Amino acid sequence: MAEYTLPDLDYDYSALEPHISGQINELHHSKHHAAYVAGANTALEKLEAAREAGDHSAIFLHEKNLAFHLGGHVNHSIWWKNLSPNGGDKPVGELAAAIDDQFGSFDKFRAQFTAAANGLQGSGWAVLGYDTLGQKLLTFQLYDQQANVPLGIIPLLQVDMWEHAFYLQYKNVKADYVTAFWNVVNWADVQDRFGKAVNQGKGLIFG
C-alpha cells in the first residue's frame, strides 16, 4: 500500500522572512504538516484492517480520521507551493482577467479573500477556488481541514488560519499576518493551478 510522504520545500525555512519567520515555517513543515502525513498513513492502515474485519463502526471512524489528516496534508502541500520568496505583486494574464470578471477588480478580490481569512471562526483556511460546474472563481472559508468545501471546487490559493501558522510571530493579531501573506503569494503557481483547473476540470463531474 502506497504511503503519503512529506514534500520538500522549494525554499529555505527563512526565505519568506520578514513576512513569515523561519521558526514558524520549520515548525509548520517539519512538525505540523508531518503530523498530518503520519496521521493519514495511520488512518489508512487502520481503515484497511477495519474493512478486512468487516467492522463497519471502525470503518466510519477511520474514514473520518483519514478525511481530516489527508485534508491537512493536501492543504499544506498547496500552501507551500502558493508561497515564494519572490512572490507578491498581482496576477497577470488569464487569471487576472478571470479575477476582474468575477470580483470586479484585484483589489475587490483581495478585500473579499482577506475578509474570509480574518472572519474565520476557529481554525481553518481561506480559499480561492475554481468552480468546475459554474466555470468561475469563488472564495470560501474551509473549516478545520476538510469541512465546508463546495463540491466540484479545485483550490487555487489558500491561506492557513490555524494559529500554528502565525501565532509565534503575530500573536493574536491575525490581520497583520494576512496582510503579510500577500507579500509572498506565488502568483505563478496560482496561475498554473487555474490553467489546469480550467482545461482539465471540464467533465469531471458532469460529462
From Swiss-Prot:
Entry's PROSITE patterns?
SOD_MN
Its domain of life reads Bacteria
Presence of keyword Transport: no
> What keyword terms does UniProt attach to this protein?
Manganese, Metal-binding, Oxidoreductase
Do you know which Pfam families this protein is assigned to?
Sod_Fe_C (PF02777), Sod_Fe_N (PF00081)
Task: Name the Enzyme Commission number(s) assigned to this protein.
Answer: 1.15.1.1
Annotated positions binding Mn(2+)? 28, 76, 160, 164
The similarity annotation says: Belongs to the iron/manganese superoxide dismutase family.
Function noted in UniProt: Destroys superoxide anion radicals which are normally produced within the cells and which are toxic to biological systems.
The protein's name: Superoxide dismutase [Mn]
